Amino acid sequence: MEHPSTNYTPEQQHEKLKYYVLIPKHLWSYIKYGTHVRYYTTQNVFRVGGFVLQNPYEAVIKNEVKTAIRLQNSFNTKAKGHVTWAVPYDNISKLYAKPDAIMLTIQENVEKALHALNQNVLTLASKIR
């Protein structure tokens, strides 16, 4: 059973994707358990996604085995309304993941190093002139 989609404006979609990173398709299978993801379907429908339960996941859909990502809406399996669902990779056009603290720290450090490198290039360029 497919969940009815909520329609989000482009502005709402942009806001919901704040702090999320677009993951290249060849890296989808590396998204680990517990990561929160959002995605666009191949029909360009925005989905708010869920937490990764299994990835990759071999799902049987209409008697066909497909590589999928299995998601859940919470970690409390006993909570009212807890659901899991599988989304085949070939039904996803764009997949976004929320980075964890380690990745955010690495990104921050790379940005600082790049800024310092750019400053060094500017200093060298001014001395050459």
From Swiss-Prot:
Residue ranges of the TM segments: none
Disulfide bonds: none
Subcellular location: Virion
GO cellular component: virion component
EC number of this enzyme: 3.1.4.-
Leading EC class: hydrolase
Keywords for the protein's UniProt record, in alphabetical order: Host-virus interaction, Hydrolase, Inhibition of host innate immune response by virus, Inhibition of host interferon signaling pathway by virus, Interferon antiviral system evasion, Viral immunoevasion, Virion
GO biological process: symbiont-mediated suppression of host innate immune response; symbiont-mediated suppression of host type I interferon-mediated signaling pathway
GO-annotated molecular function: hydrolase activity
Family: Belongs to the asfivirus C129R family.
Purpose: Plays a role in the inhibition of type I interferon signaling pathway. Mechanistically, specifically interacts with 2',3'-cGAMP and cleaves it via its phosphodiesterase activity. In turn, prevents 2',3'-cGAMP interaction with host ER-resident STING1 leading to inhibition of downstream signaling pathway and type I interferon production.
Name assigned to this protein: Uncharacterized protein C129R
Upper taxonomic lineage: Viruses, Varidnaviria, Bamfordvirae, Nucleocytoviricota, Pokkesviricetes
